[in-house]
Curated annotation (Swiss-Prot):
Chain's role: Troponin T is the tropomyosin-binding subunit of troponin, the thin filament regulatory complex which confers calcium-sensitivity to striated muscle actomyosin ATPase activity.
Region of interest called Disordered, as start-end residue ranges on this chain: 1-23, 61-169, 237-257, 313-384
GO MF entries: tropomyosin binding
Keyword 4Fe-4S: no
Record protein name field: Troponin T
GO CC, alphabetical: troponin complex
Length: 384
């Protein structure tokens, strides 16, 4: 049920509610006049409220009808716009499908033409070969021709580019520029065509600049990759050389290292030079062993000769096996000291000393022990 039908039912119900009230008032008019008066006042107040409610309801209904009308208008406009959009989309899809079909047909046509061209070239080559064979049979000469060797036969394209002279490069540059740079031909063009020509040139400049930037970035990236790969290869070669017991820079040089001979029994890498190995086969093992023994004995002799030489105590007496530079014994020192003064004196005669008593002998022994300890301490201090 629509809103209009509901509203019409409410309008019909309102007067139905008011009729019994009037009938009640008519029935009660026969009673107390004051009561009747109050009832009339109440009925009039209710009628006014009802009228206000009806007026408010009609305003609200008119507003809702207006909003509903606006919504219906928007809906109809949206339907029209959607239909137009669907129509445009269908047209665009149709054009896209036609373009795709046309491209497929053009590609097929190009493939057919390319195949026909290859077949024609193959047929021409075959006919030329047959003609050459016929001429050869007629001439009855050698079936081959020796051509002069091109100097750039075994050279790569990069080597050929590097070996080109300056004049050749200039000539190639002129030829390439003549293909790329075309004449403008703007003599008989009006303003609109000149604008179109300017936009075309601007687009070409933008395209060339973008290609230039892309190539520069690609070159930077490739240079970085090459540096990284070279460094990685260098590190791997260093580790490989260290594993083989070689110098870390042995494998990174211009020439490869010499072949290392591994011991069959010890499973060790032989790091000796070629000359050392050659001496082994020439009977140099004895010389090597003698040289090593001489080095050992020489080092021991140097340690013995450079030892610290201490002075002997006076009670030691004469040193046996005295050599040049060794400290003299106490007797020799006293003899040298007295030699300069008492050379002309006669040798004195001494009387035998009396035998000492036991107490004196013990005291002398203690004194001698103390002197020995003092001399040992002095020698230790001198050595330090």
């Amino acid at each position: 049920m629509s809103d209009e039908e509901e509203y019409s039912e409410e309008e019909e119900e309102v007067p139905v509610d008011t009729k019994p009230r009037h009938s009640v008032i008519v029935v009660e008019e026969k009673g107390d006049p004051e009561f009747v008066k109050r009832q009339e006042q109440k009925s009039s107040a209710l009628d006014e409220q009802l009228k206000e409610y009806i007026a408010e309801w009609r305003k609200q209904r008119a507003k809702e009808e207006e909003d509903l009308k606006k919504l219906k208008d928007k809906q109809s406009k949206r339907k029209v716009m959607r239909a137009d959009e669907e129509k445009r989309m269908a047209e665009r899809k149709k054009q896209e499908e036609e373009r795709r079909v046309r491209e497929i047909e053009e590609k097929k046509q190009r493939d057919i033409e390319e195949k026909r061209r290859r077949l024609e070239e193959a047929e021409k080559k075959r006919q030329a070969m047959m003609q050459a064979l016929k001429e050869q049979k007629q001439q009855k000469g050698p079936n081959f021709t020796i051509q002069k060797k091109d100097p750039s036969f075994n050279m790569s394209s990069a080597q050929i580019e590097r070996n080109k002279t300056k004049e050749q490069l200039e000539e190639e540059k002129k030829i390439s520029l003549s293909f790329r740079i075309k004449p403008l031909e703007i003599e008989n063009l009006n303003v609109d065509k000149l604008k179109v020509k300017a936009t075309e040139l601007w687009d070409a400049i933008v395209k060339l600049e973008t290609e230039k930037y892309d190539l520069e970035e690609r070159q930077k990236r490739q240079d970085y990759d090459l540096k990284e790969l070279k460094e990685r290869q260098k590190q791997q070669l260093r580790h490989k050389a260290l594993k083989k017991g070689l110098d870390p820079e042995a494998l990174t040089g211009k020439y490869p290292p010499k072949i290392q001979v591994a011991s069959k029994y010890e499973r060790r890498v032989d790091t000796r030079s070629y000359d050392d190995k050659k001496k082994l086969f020439e009977g140099g093992w004895a010389t090597l062993s003698s040289e090593s023994n001489e080095k050992v004995w020489k080092s021991k002799y140097e340690l013995f000769a450079n030892r610290s030489k201490s002075k002997l105590p006076k009670w030691f007496g004469e040193r046996p096996g005295k050599k040049k530079g060794d400290p003299e014994s106490p007797e020799e020192e006293e003899v040298k000291a007295d030699a300069g003064v008492d050379d002309e004196l006669e040798e004195p005669t001494f009387e035998p000393e009396p035998e000492p008593e036991p107490e004196e002998e013990a005291a002398e022994e203690e004194a001698e022990e103390e002197e020995e300890e003092e001399e040992e301490e002095e020698e230790e201090e001198e050595e330090e």
